[in-house]
Amino acid sequence: MALMVKAEGGNGGKRWDDGFDYEGVTKIYVRGGLEGIQFIKFDYVKDGKTITGPIHGVSGRGLTQTFEINHLQKEYLLSIEGYYDISTGVIQSIQFKTNQQTSDMMGFNEGTKFSLRSMRGRIIGFHGFADKNLYSLRAYYIRIPATKSAMDGGQNTGRGYDHGGDYDGVRKVYVTFDGTSIRNMRVDYDKVGQVECYEYGVKIGTQNQFTINYPYECITSVGGSYADTQPYRCIVLRSLTFKTSNGRTSVFGKETGTTFLLESQGNAIVGFHGRVGSCVDSIGEYYAPFSPYPPPTEKLEGQGGDGGDSWDDGAFLNVKKVCIGQGQFGIVSVKFEYENDASEVVVGDEHGKATLLGYEEFELDYPSEYITSVEACQDKVMGAETGVLTMLRFKTNIRISPSFGLKAGFNFVLEKEGHKINGFHGKSSSMLHQIGIHVIPITE
């Protein structure tokens, strides 16, 4: 049965629907123009044959780009990202990701970002809204079955346990170790937003836990060791090591005997199976494609004066460069350089008034360096009816920038513990009145 993913994009246009009676998508056509994406068209696969879908939108002056998906090599479409203009509703750019590759961003990286994806699903059809341009996309998808691995550890002792592979992901793992062997395990799974738990073994020893930041993180591999162990007179697990998509690792027990590693490139672990008695004798996994959601961005309120017009660069993957323009009494303009999810450089607009002195720059050693806080000074100066910012200084995970401007009035700091800055907003006129930040959790 095909399930529907909610619409993404703007409002407007007439409804269209390609249906979902297909095995997958094999080619995508996107035509872009000055106002955004003019049309989109899909080639589908049905009974091994290519079915060409209709054009959704209108073909005007512009450029058509294509993206091919090789279904003969078991390639399938997983997700879509892009940007739309919130004022016109027209989709401005679009990018496609399969289990094997990612397309170029087609169109302009401007506007409000959207993402179209489903947990554990591959896209097999589309519907949406279009008129003279493309306004929104919806997708039909089917669930991708999990693949069952072999077991490592004792193969014949104890009794079997099998959680199956029908879960969306793992939320938490509890492991009990008695100083010699893994005695007990409990796994908390996520299934359509609900938690389901499995526990097996004998809870003797010290229990520790490992929490996964699902759905922004997944377990990508499980390793460990096993050995013939007394007094059980059989092979049992002596240690376990879990690794996540964010590079975090959690180790339980002591490595002894034969080591093993269970992982499948590009996949996440969504279930466990094996054998258990007085100890956990063996472990195996269920693998499935899993694309962790990007961490949610949080917009922190700006601080400073109330004058000027509001501006907002939005949120990006990271900040690459800060440009500061100074005047006689304070900061007159700022401009920021970002990197987006497609690893493209995005130069933000100039906020404030251009200065003949040009910009002073603070460039980050990206991607290892990122901004964690901004310190600023606010004061009321000649020629300004409300407070303006007279100084800015940026702190990263490595260093502190020089102070740009003059320390006057009172100062404030913008930051959130455990987060990094990935965008800026504020207010400006002929000077900078206010600054605020977008932040995301630090996962490195």
From Swiss-Prot:
Q: What is the lineage of its organism?
A: Eukaryota, Viridiplantae, Streptophyta, Embryophyta, Tracheophyta
What SMART domains does the record tag this protein with?
Jacalin
Annotated keywords: Acetylation, Lectin, Repeat
Coiled coil location: none
Q: Which domain of life is it from?
A: Eukaryota
By what name is this protein known? Jacalin-related lectin 42
Q: Gene for this protein? A: JAL42
Q: Which cysteines are joined by disulfide bonds?
A: none
Q: Taking every annotated instance into account, which residue ranges of this chain make up the domain Jacalin-type lectin?
A: 2-143, 146-289, 297-441
Q: Record the organism.
A: Arabidopsis thaliana
Q: List-wise, which residues carry N-acetylalanine?
A: 2
Pfam families reported for this sequence: Jacalin
| InterPro entries named in the record | Jacalin-like_lectin_dom (IPR001229), Jacalin-like_lectin_dom_plant (IPR033734), Jacalin-like_lectin_dom_sf (IPR036404)
Q: Which family does the entry's similarity section mention?
A: Belongs to the jacalin lectin family.
What GO molecular function annotation could you give as one example from this UniProt entry? Answer: carbohydrate binding
